[in-house]
Design a protein with these regions (language model features):
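Glycine-rich phosphate-binding loops that contact phosphosugars or nucleotide phosphates
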Residues: 41-47, 52-160
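A short, well-structured juxtamembrane/interface segment
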Residues: 21-38
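Hydrophobic packing residues in well-ordered alpha-helices of helical domains and bundles
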Residues: 6, 10, 29-32, 54
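A short, charged, Gly/Pro-tolerant segment at domain boundaries
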Residues: 1-3, 164, 170-188
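Generic N-terminal amphipathic, Lys/Arg-enriched alpha-helix
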Residues: 1-22
Length: 188
C-alpha cells in the first residue's frame, strides 16, 4: 500500500515539474546562454536551496571551461564591469541575494535573475529574468500549486532549466561529455 502512495507522489511531483517547464520562456533560456558566452566572467549567487542550484550551475559552467565564481567563496574575486551575475531567488526578496545584485549593479556588472517574481526587488535590479513558475515557500498568488513543501518545485525546475542553459552552452562551445569529464575534479 505504501508503495502505491510513493508511486503516486513521484508521478505528482513529475507532473508539477512538467507543468512548470512547459510554462517557461525558451527565448529567455537561449538569451541567458548567449549572454554567458559573451561575458567576461560569470558569478552565481543564491541562499539556501537556491544557492545549491546556483552552485550546481557553476559546476557545470566550470566543466564547460567558462570563467565562473560562486559569490561568498574565499577565492571569489571582485565583481566588475563586463561581468555577469546569475542571482537565484524564488521570491526575489532574499536579502543576501538582493544585496549581492545591488553591489554587482553598482560595480557595473549585469545581473540576471532566476525567480518567480519579476516585479520583486531582485527582478527589478536584473537586466533580464528567467521566470520559473514554481511554488516558493510563500505560496503567493499566481504561484503554481504544489504538493511539495516550501520551494521544492522552484528548486527542481531551476535545476533543470539551468542544466538546459548548460547544455545549450555545451553545444555552442562544442564541449562533449568526454571533454567536460576532463575538467571534473580529480581530487575527490
Amino acid at each position: 500500500m505504501t508503495e502505491h502512495l510513493t508511486e503516486g507522489l513521484k508521478k505528482q511531483i513529475l507532473a508539477e515539474i512538467d507543468t512548470a517547464l512547459a510554462s517557461t520562456d525558451d527565448g529567455a533560456v537561449e538569451s541567458l546562454a548567449v549572454t554567458l558566452l559573451s561575458t567576461r566572467r560569470i558569478f552565481v549567487t543564491g541562499e539556501g536551496r537556491s544557492g545549491f542550484m546556483a552552485k550546481a550551475f557553476a559546476m557545470r559552467l566550470m566543466h564547460l571551461g567558462l570563467p565562473v565564481h560562486v559569490v561568498g567563496e574565499t577565492t571569489t574575486p571582485a565583481v566588475a564591469e563586463g561581468d555577469t551575475v546569475v542571482a537565484v531567488s524564488g521570491s526575489g526578496t532574499t536579502p543576501g541575494t538582493v544585496r549581492v545584485a545591488e553591489q554587482a549593479t553598482q560595480a557595473g556588472a549585469q545581473v540576471h535573475a532566476v525567480t518567480t517574481a519579476p516585479d520583486s526587488p531582485l527582478g527589478t535590479l536584473a537586466a533580464t529574468s528567467l521566470l520559473i513558475p514554481g511554488a516558493t515557500k510563500y505560496r503567493r498568488p499566481g504561484e503554481a500549486p504544489s504538493v511539495q513543501p516550501l520551494s521544492s518545485l522552484f528548486d527542481q525546475t531551476t535545476h533543470i532549466l539551468l542544466d538546459v542553459v548548460a547544455l545549450r552552452l555545451a553545444g555552442l562551445l562544442s564541449v562533449d561529455n568526454d571533454r567536460a569529464r576532463k575538467a571534473h575534479a580529480n581530487t575527490e
